Amino acid sequence: RQMCIRDRVWVGDTLYEGAAVVLATGHSARDIYELLHRRGVRLEAKPFAMGVRIEHPQALIDSIQYHCESRGEYLPAASYSLVSQEGGRGVYSFCMCPGGFIVPAMTDAAESVVNGMSPSGRNSVFANSGLVTEVRLADFEHLRAEWGELAGLKFQQQFERLARQYGGEHQIAPAQRVADFVAGRASGSLPRTSYIPGVVPSRLDKWMPGFIASSLRAGIATFGRRMRGFLTNEALVVGVESRTSTPVR
């Protein structure tokens, strides 16, 4: 039976009544957004954020935050929270994972998307965090004529497909050493990473949207002045972190 949303909803043969209906799909359900748009449900484009995952050796973050060579057996894996304004655009860390892993998070084989997680013991030798910058409505205005209120979704998808293009099959992700990313040079090799599918060297600073690359490079330089050692070629940026929030509401 076709579902009708007014003050009641049919789901199969069951009738649910109420003053409102919450459709809790999760922010990566692009097919649901497109279905609602086709059915005439009002959607509205909104600002969101995109960037990369940045990964350091956990021992390096420990030494920066605890100001000692080793945290010992009693202190937990150190974390951080960073934010700056670069050219009027916000840059910030997101979902920092001490003692954690970078994990694949794509919902389509044609995309490359990464996220992070920490096991309960926070006992990985790596620390990672999302590092993102704000994406404004004006940044995807050029897609509005064709996609309307779904333009942000399409901009997000284009970013993720570029990452897949410069990464590889089987969820291999594009990556670049952090100091190389900031300096605008290629990485001839990559350090070890927690990302199990693997990474390949790539000039993220060249193929990602220019405003994202420039904002992240400036932000990392700022964070390197606040946390001595943060800006280092021992660290990696891995592409891409693009699902911090939904581009529509």
Q: Where do the model's predicted regions map?
A:
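Residues forming the flavin
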Residues: Q2, R6-R249
